[in-house]
Amino acid sequence: MRKATITRKTKETAIEVAVDLDGTGVSQVATGIGFFDHMLDLLARHSRIDIKVKADGDLHVDYHHTVEDVGIALGQAVKQALGSMAGITRYASLYMPMDETLTRVAIDISGRPALVFKAEFPRDKIGEFDTELVREWFNAFAGNAGITLHVETLYGENSHHIAESCFKGLARALRAAVAIDPRAAGEVPSTKGQLGG
C-alpha cells in the first residue's frame, strides 16, 4: 500500500497530511486559505492521489508559513509513500491548457530535488492569496518529495488560470510518473539500481 501520513508542528503551524498514491483523487483539505484549498483539491482530483490536509497556521501574520509548511509535509508524504520507488514510471511531461493559459510541466522522480519554475503573474494577489506563494509551495513540495520538477507557463493573462494550470499540470504529471509500469517487473527505474544521489 503506497500510503503515508506526516505530522509537522512548529511555532508557526500545525500540519497533518495523508496521501494514498493509489487512490481515486478524494480530497479533504482545510488550510484556512480558500484559494489554496482550491489548488490542493485540484491536485488531488487530477493526480488521482487521495490527499488529506489539515493545517492550523499563523494566518494573522500572512499565508506564507502555512503554504510553505503544507508543501513540505505533502512532499515528505509523497516521498514516504513512494518507498523504494520500485516499478514506478518515474518520468512524465505534458502541456496543461487553462483557457488562454498554457503551462508545460516535466517531472523526474529521481530522488534528487530540483525546481525550475517560470511563471509570471500579472497580479500580485489572487483574492487575498499572494501569487509569489505559488512558487514557494512548488519549491517546498519538490524539495521534500525529492523530485526534479520543471514548471513553465508559456503564456497566460489571468493569474488564477496561471496558478491553476501549474497545479493541474503537476497533478497530471505526478499521476503518470508515480504509476506502476507492469513491464518494469518491480525494478527501480535507474541503471544505478537505486534512485537518489
From Swiss-Prot:
Pathway: Amino-acid biosynthesis; L-histidine biosynthesis; L-histidine from 5-phospho-alpha-D-ribose 1-diphosphate: step 6/9. GO terms for molecular function: imidazoleglycerol-phosphate dehydratase activity. It catalyses: D-erythro-1-(imidazol-4-yl)glycerol 3-phosphate = 3-(imidazol-4-yl)-2-oxopropyl phosphate + H2O. The keyword Amino-acid biosynthesis applies. Its main location: cytoplasm. The keyword Cytoplasm applies. Pfam families: IGPD. SUPFAM superfamilies: Ribosomal protein S5 domain 2-like. InterPro entries: IGPD_sf, ImidazoleglycerolP_deHydtase, ImidazoleglycerP_deHydtase_CS, Ribosomal_Su5_D2-typ_SF. Its EC number is 4.2.1.19. GO terms for cellular component: cytoplasm. It is found in: Cytoplasm. One of its GO terms (biological process) is L-histidine biosynthetic process. It is an enzyme of class 4 (lyase). Keywords: Amino-acid biosynthesis, Cytoplasm, Histidine biosynthesis, Lyase. Gene3D superfamilies: Imidazole glycerol phosphate dehydratase, domain 1. Belongs to the imidazoleglycerol-phosphate dehydratase family. This is Imidazoleglycerol-phosphate dehydratase. It comes from Rhodopseudomonas palustris (strain BisA53).
